[in-house]
Curated annotation (Swiss-Prot):
Source species taxonomy: Archaea, Methanobacteriati, Methanobacteriota, Methanomada group, Methanococci
Keyword presence, Protein transport: no
NCBIfam families: F420_cofC
Encoding gene, per UniProt annotation: cofC
GO molecular function: GTP binding; phospholactate guanylyltransferase activity
Reactions that this protein is recorded to catalyse: (2S)-2-phospholactate + GTP + H(+) = (2S)-lactyl-2-diphospho-5'-guanosine + diphosphate
Annotated organism of origin: Methanococcus aeolicus (strain ATCC BAA-1280 / DSM 17508 / OCM 812 / Nankai-3)
Entry protein name: 2-phospho-L-lactate guanylyltransferase
Length: 224
């Protein structure tokens, strides 16, 4: 049996690197749409889905969905503390940890990943920036070491516990959304997702570039 655990930061602090491109309310709607894409990608595979957050609004938003909310207490500091706190509420042996900002994740990705799972194994999917965008583990196998270059930290943690981690590179899972350029990946590869449709609603588009300056430019059209 597999469960999924999705940690979500307080909405007033999400995606600050997009603050010059999206308003605070737009950034909140962006994270909600990305979260729905992640939910749709993992829900066909997982027996239960847990979301851990300090934010009442995000947990309230998820009430119509088959999600088990876990409200963090005020004394929890950081992502690893939040995950360890959430583990106390999870009954399933195998846990898929995934962030809320990888909206290109697909059911097929999760299917292929869980097929690799063995007893007491750890599966790691790296992000483009050195982080860990998805991890499958038994809660007793290793400690989570998110923040910074967590992909390398998790490999080190596995070695310290005599576990040979299974590395599962995935283009779609590797794309997390933090910058304006990241939005372009959704506009190119994410047709049909909640996130894609939301960006289009905001009149945001990706314009191809034919130079060494980059593959594309993300623009927002003024409709006034």
């Amino acid at each position: 049996m597999f469960s999924a655990l999705i940690p979500v930061s307080p909405l007033n602090a999400v995606k600050t690197r997009l603050k010059d491109f999206l308003t605070p309310d737009e950034r909140i709607e962006l994270i909600k749409n990305m979260l729905l894409d992640v939910y749709e990608g993992i829900s066909p595979i997982c027996d239960k889905i847990y979301v851990v957050s300090k934010d009442k609004e995000i947990l309230e938003f998820l009430k119509p969905y088959a999600v088990i909310p876990i409200m963090e207490t005020e004394n929890i500091k950081g992502l690893n503390d939040a995950l360890n706190y959430a583990f106390n509420y999870i009954e399933e042996d195998n846990i898929i940890i995934t962030p809320a900002d990888i909206p290109l994740i697909k059911k097929e990705n999760i299917n292929n990943i869980v097929k690799e799972c063995k007893e007491n194994s750890v599966i790691l999917c790296p992000s483009r920036g050195g982080g860990t965008n998805l991890m499958v583990l038994n809660r007793s196998s290793i400690k989570t070491r998110y923040e910074g270059f967590s992909f390398l930290k998790h490999i080190e943690e596995c070695k310290e516990n005599n576990i040979n981690p299974i590395i599962f590179p995935s283009f779609y899972i590797s794309i997390d959304i933090n910058t304006v350029e990241d939005l372009g990946e959704i506009l190119i590869h994410g047709g049909g997702t909640y996130t894609y449709n939301y960006l289009k609603k905001l009149n945001i588009n990706a314009k191809p570039k034919h130079s060494s300056a980059g593959r594309f430019e993300v623009i927002r059209q003024n409709t006034e």
